[in-house]
Amino acid sequence: MQLTVKALKGKEAHIQVSEGDTVLAVKRLVEEKLQVPVSQQRLLFRGKSLADEHCLSHYSIGPGSRLNLMVKDQVAPEGHSGNNTAWKSLSVILRKHFSPADAERVLEYVQKDYERSLSLLSLDDIERLATRILHPQYSEAADLGFLD
């Protein structure tokens, strides 16, 4: 089905999607068409903000629907843009080996799993990781201590 995505500043794009596509997949298509990074996009349908993980069918978005695009100001902490580069690189690699739809699904899964893994880290986990990175000589001794 075809959707129209209209940015508040006048740009407009027509994209081809299916009802089973996620909002995140739509955002990636919008990024290609309008050159607006996914991280800066906020899509609205009938005044309601759309969540990345939901399918278009969840919001009853059908053929010919019109989505509004709000562009957020670019505010990214240092080092965060490297994450975007990593996801783009992974996307390029996946598209070489899978169909575009399958590559998109795999990328979404990896991103969700990555975010989930990060959210499960405790402060103790982060402290142990930091110690191993900053003081590798101490972490080896600490690892041996757990074996006793």
From Swiss-Prot:
Q: What GO terms in the biological process aspect are recorded for it? A: post-translational protein targeting to endoplasmic reticulum membrane; tail-anchored membrane protein insertion into ER membrane
Keyword tags: Cytoplasm, Nucleus, Transport
Primary location class:
cytoplasm
**Gene3D superfamilies, per database record:** Phosphatidylinositol 3-kinase Catalytic Subunit, Chain A, domain 1 (3.10.20.90)
Annotated CDD domains: Ubl_UBL4A_like
Query: How is this protein organized at the quaternary level?
Result: Component of the bag6/bat3 complex.
Name of the protein in question:
Ubiquitin-like protein 4A
Q: Which organism is it from?
A: Xenopus laevis
The organism that produces this protein has a lineage beginning with: Eukaryota, Metazoa, Chordata, Craniata, Vertebrata
